[in-house]
């Protein structure tokens, strides 16, 4: 099992905390965000971790090498003009190595805090594409937002499969959980993921975004539509997202 952390972001809403550090190195309750992710992944038995940086790449690179001996470091030089999917594909070489070595691959956002227990549940899923879903999302969202519906996204599950995610909801009935930014590709499925990416129309719009700025949820939705759903790895809290300075006051 390998993992790739997408850590190219600037984190403008966390300024001035991100003036001298990338977003993933902001401190939360005594540790940097990326510390929690690496410790959770390693604690669940992930054998190899790669990181894609962007903003203040050399700061992140130095920290990864000195604190965690992580050498698989990739750079999204266009981090300020692209989004998550492009950041992930900056590590295409790493994705292809998972295919060659028959290693499943966990993809993690870099601004979330989660436990090894959540990673273990994801590892245990046997689906080609598995997505962690928080069924108790409203507990966290009500701490973060005056109106949770405004920031939440749709997520629909049927018979253990995620069929839709990432759209703007009209009501709470359209939200059966929240995507937290943590998912897994099986090594059998990764070639199809790369083929699907290569087949996408570079001139098209994806949920209102151009190809280079496509949301990860739009990409995952495309895979779901093409290949028939994704396994829902259901959790009940136990994680948090750090997007605003106020999030730093919330306990996971």
Name each model feature, range by range:
Residues 1, 158, 172-252:
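Conserved alpha/beta core of the MobA/IspD/sugar-nucleotide pyrophosphorylase nucleotidyltransferase superfamily
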Residues 1-5, 31-104:
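Conserved N-terminal catalytic core of the sugar/cofactor nucleotidyltransferase
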Residues 1-19:
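N-terminal nucleotide-binding beta1-loop-alpha1 segment
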Residues 7, 53, 109, 133:
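Short beta-strand/turn micro-motifs composed of small residues
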Residues 20-35:
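Short catalytic helix/loop segments, enriched in acidic residues and glycine
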Residues 101-113:
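Short beta-strand-to-loop acidic/aromatic patch adjacent to the donor-nucleotide binding site
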Residues 115-196, 200:
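Conserved core of the sugar-phosphate nucleotidyltransferase
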